[in-house]
Structures are given as C-alpha cells and as structure tokens.
Design a protein with these regions (language model features):
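Flavin (primarily FAD) cofactor-binding/catalytic cores of flavoenzymes
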Residues: 1-225
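Mid-to-C-terminal Rossmann-like scaffold of FAD/NAD(P)H-dependent oxidoreductases
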Residues: 223-234
Length: 234
C-alpha cells in the first residue's frame, strides 16, 4: 500500500503467497487497517535462554494442556493467557506451574501447584533465576505469555504504525486516526490492548464511518497530538 501525496490517494496491490499479483492495483481515498495485532508474538530476550534444553514456545502456539503433563512449566507473563494456561496445565496433569509477573503479583487464590514469582532475570539451562534472588530448578518447558507486537509489513513505511501494545498507543487520534502521515486518511482499528475488545471495535467502526462520511470535523494537528499524548501518558 502506497500513498501519493500529490494526488492524495492510496494505491493497494494484492499478491498471493507466491508473490504474484492476483488483482490489478486499486485506488482509494481512505485506508482502514483492521488486520489486528494478535498474530505476531512478542518474544522478550533473556540472558541464557539459548542454554535452556527444554521446549520454549509462545502462548500463540499453545494448543493442548496434555502436552505438559508431568512437567514443571514456567509461564512468563501473568495476564490473561498466563492465568488461563497455568490453570489448564495443572488441571491436566502438570507437576507445577510457575507464573512470572513483571511488576506486581496477581493475588489470585491459585491451586496449590501454581506459584507466582517476580521478574525473570536470567536462565542457566533448566534453572530459572528471578529478581528476588531466588531460583527454581528442573524446569521442563517455558511458555511466553508476553503478548503481541503490531506488524504491518504491507503498509508504506511512512504510514506504518509502530508501537508496543498498550491501552492507548501513540500517534492515533481518538485511538484510530494516524496522525504522522497520509493526510489524516489512514485509520487503524483495534490497536489497543484492552479487555472489552469487541465493544471497542464497534465504537471505533462507528467513529471511522462518521469521519469518512464527513460528519466529524477534525481539530488542528497540534490539538490532535495533544489529545493522544494526554491519553498515552496516563
């Protein structure tokens, strides 16, 4: 997808997986990016991870709790996926699940075989070290429950939104309108990392439709930047 600032129009080319064009280029006045951000896993790097002899995967790849039966499993990340997978692993026979949190413990009434540990610092083969100077030995598998990253390789570089997942990502007025290029005609839907996902999708879709139809008048660029920054910094 490219933008011609002189014509103020976008050109979209579609290819199949073999890199062959399957449709002639199409031209548009607005671009709505609604491909989501739950497809490219976020894999943080930890010293010594390459020495770990067991299985390492992301929650995106998790399919069957029975695969971890009889194992001691470390879950890096204590949000929704970490909580769910820990409970499922224990329910279906895991020996122990260690949930590693980044800032504060969840405080949940876990089953007896689930324990919480603070930030992971480094790994020495099957021994995991934590920020409170404790360690856990003989870990069999590590599951990263560390979210996803926005990945939009199909967008022109100047129009590609770059941000870690957050409640209110930068550069998006009203959480939708990209303010750094495209003459205020590029909109990203669903970039927020929130609990009420589908309700948010509906609201963003309504706002986007009204904006494209001309029912919403934008403030000056400086005001839009001030607006999204005030939300992003909360």
């Amino acid at each position: 997808m490219t933008h011609d600032p002189q014509k103020d129009e976008f050109t979209v080319s579609v290819e199949n997986l073999q890199g062959k064009h399957v449709l002639p280029p199409q031209h548009f006045d607005y671009i709505c990016v609604a491909s989501g951000h739950y497809s490219t896993p976020n894999f943080p790097e930890y010293p010594g991870i390459e020495t770990f002899p067991g299985r390492v995967l992301h929650s995106h790849e998790f399919r069957n709790s029975l695969e971890f039966s009889g194992q001691k499993v470390l879950l890096v990340g204590s949000s929704y996926s970490g909580e769910d997978i820990a409970a499922q692993a224990i329910k279906f026979g895991a020996k122990e699940a260690i949930v590693c949190y980044r800032s504060v413990p969840t405080g949940l009434p876990w089953p007896k075989n689930i324990i919480e540990k603070p930030l992971l610092t480094h790994i020495e083969r099957k021994t995991i070290h934590f920020s409170d100077n404790t360690q856990i030995d003989e870990v069999d598998s590590i599951i990263f429950c560390t979210g996803y990253i926005g990945h939009f390789p199909f967008m022109q570089d100047s129009l590609r939104h770059r941000s870690a997942n957050s409640f209110y990502p930068p550069d998006l007025y009203k959480g939708v309108l990209y303010t750094q290029g495209g003459n205020n005609k590029v909109l990203y839907l669903g970039r927020q990392d929130v609990a009420y996902t589908f309700t948010m999708f509906d609201v963003q879709a309504f706002w986007t439709a009204k904006y494209i139809l001309g029912d919403i008048e934008l403030p000056k660029n400086e005001e839009m930047e001030t607006n999204w920054k005030s939300w992003h910094e909360r």
